[in-house]
Amino acid sequence: VTCGVVPGLMMFVLFQNIQEDSTSVYYLTEEYFYMGFVPYLGFFITLASCYRLAKFNIDTRQTDSFIGLPTPANALVIMSIPMIQYSNDYEGLTTVLYNPYLLLFITAISSYILNAEIPLFSLKIKEFTWAKYKMQILFLIGSLFSFSLLGFVAIPLIIISYVLVSVISNKMMAKA
C-alpha cells in the first residue's frame, strides 16, 4: 500500500510546490483555466496503484513475470523526481521537472502503465542458468552501470528501459 500512497502524495506535493513557486507556465494557464485542483490529480497514481494491487492479488498469470509495472518500480520513478530536482547536478533537467504539464503527463503514463496488459520480465531467479536468465543479468549489469554514472537520474531511465526491453523481448518471442 505504501508504494501506492507515497507516490500519489509526492506528486501532490510536487504540484503544490509549482503553485507556490509561481512559475510563469502555471500562471499563464491559470488565467484561462482554474488550476487549483491540479495537485489532487497526483492521487490518480494512488488510485491506479490500488487497482493494480487488487488486480494483482487475483491474477494467476503473474507467477513468473509481471503484467503491468509493479507498484514499487512505479514508486521509484515518482520518488526519483524530487531527488533529481534537489540534487542540482542537472540544472536543465531540474527546470524541466518543474513543468506542471510534464508532471501531468508522468501522472497519466504512470497510472496507465501500472495496469497495462504488458508482460514484464521478472528479476526472480529460481535456478541460475545463463541461457535462461541472460536478459535479466545483462539488464541488472546495465542498470548498475547506469546508476553509477548518472545517480538518481538513472532511476527513471532504468524503469523505462525495463518496460522497453520487456516489450521488445515479448515481440521477439511472439515472432519465434
Task: List the model feature ranges, each with a label.
Residues 52-58, 63-65:
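Contiguous mid-protein beta-loop-alpha structural module that forms a pocket-lining wall or clamp
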